[in-house]
């Protein structure tokens, strides 16, 4: 079963685990573990996607409980009326707070996007980022005798494919566990020494700016273990929990 963070008559929010597909495509038609089908079976009604999370990303995923609700949610995402906040563990010490305005060329899949236009120019892509903490661990990686990691808060202002992963790679602070845009040597070291065997990117919060509602997704065991090893426990208090209760018997946390 998936953790339901919030549900009302219009929408449902779940905490998507890393490694789960949001929905099947013709490329993944034999996939057994899919968020949409699991939520449908769990709550007993159809759900409609409003946005996406990459397969390796964990965290808050919103779905409409009708096609109209899904359409309106998607529209709010497009118009930036719903804000998203992520947390990531990155290579090196990213300590400043800034806005990166760096256009991105659309990434096309050779199979899924084989009919898409390939002559598109770079599309606007803007990300606000803020360094929260740093750590230096006594583990040699490559030619360096120690390994440095940073905990970063991210707010995408646009929604390009793999935007956060590509923007952090552009800053030379790739997300740990990113097999496509990251540092393979760092990924192997993180997995071997600290159990970081997945993309360390988590969609922590989705506030609805028109309503006094913010939905927070708790961190999984891999994240909690990393925060403990790096001395970062207490820095993400709204997300650092494994089990908790909420009004109406919902497994979630709603802050307003």
Predicted segments, located by residue:
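RNA pseudouridine synthases
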Residues: 1-256
């Amino acid at each position: 079963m998936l953790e339901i963070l919030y549900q009302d008559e219009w929408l449902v929010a779940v905490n998507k685990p890393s490694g789960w597909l949001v929905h099947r495509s013709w490329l993944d038609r034999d996939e057994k573990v899919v968020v949409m089908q699991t939520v449908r079976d769990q709550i007993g009604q159809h759900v409609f996607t409003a946005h996406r999370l990459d397969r390796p990303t964990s965290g808050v995923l919103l779905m409409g409980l009708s096609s109209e609700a899904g359409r309106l949610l998607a529209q709010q995402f497009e118009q930036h009326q719903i804000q998203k906040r992520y947390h990531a563990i990155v290579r090196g010490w990213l300590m400043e707070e800034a806005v990166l305005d760096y256009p991105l060329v659309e990434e096309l899949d050779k199979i899924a996007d084989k009919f898409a236009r390939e002559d598109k120019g770079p599309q606007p892509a803007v990300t606000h980022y803020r360094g929260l903490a740093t750590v230096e661990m006594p583990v040699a990686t490559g030619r360096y005798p120690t390994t440095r990691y940073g905990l970063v808060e991210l707010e995408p202002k646009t929604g390009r494919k793999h935007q956060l992963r590509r923007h952090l790679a552009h800053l030379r602070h790739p997300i740990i566990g990113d097999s496509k845009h990251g540092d393979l040597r760092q990924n192997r070291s993180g997995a071997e020494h600290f159990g970081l065997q997945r993309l360390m990117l988590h969609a922590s919060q989705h506030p609805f700016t028109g309503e006094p509602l913010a939905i927070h997704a708790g961190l999984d065991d891999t994240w909690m273990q990393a925060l403990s090893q790096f001395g970062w426990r207490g820095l993400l208090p709204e997300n650092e929990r494994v089990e908790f209760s909420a009004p109406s018997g919902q497994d979630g946390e709603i802050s307003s």
